[in-house]
Amino acid sequence: VMAGELGGVAEPGLILTPPQNGTLLDDGYLSASEVAQLKLNADWVLLSACNTAAADGTPGAEGLSGLAKGFFYAGARSLLVSNWYVVSDAAVRITTQMLQAYTDKPNAGKAEALRQAMGKLRADPNYAHPLFWAPFVVVGEGGASRW
């Protein structure tokens, strides 16, 4: 969710399945500031939901200053994020194909794995329009391995 997108939500975050008996600390909403407090040792975090590269809601804020910044601050080294609305089935296909490409050739890098997945989606006439594949980008350590 982008900052200000829902009433009462001042910062970007992820809407999770709420617990049966929610509390103030466990309400089903993981805000960017809550993410930043996590201690992660994550090589790659996939944020394939809508607008995960959006700004933090501050007027004039840069992209990636919201949820993405929180994950980097928490310890993620790479992120897959989206720059706008995503179509759910296309997001599933692109992330699945991207992870397969990365598993097959990890030394090629995360960005290359995404490029290959985008190419496969573009080759399908039902998903050739950029609406389906263009929202996604790898940020952080996405390049090829040097060794």
Each model region followed by its residue ranges:
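Catalytic cores of enzymes
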Residues: 1-147
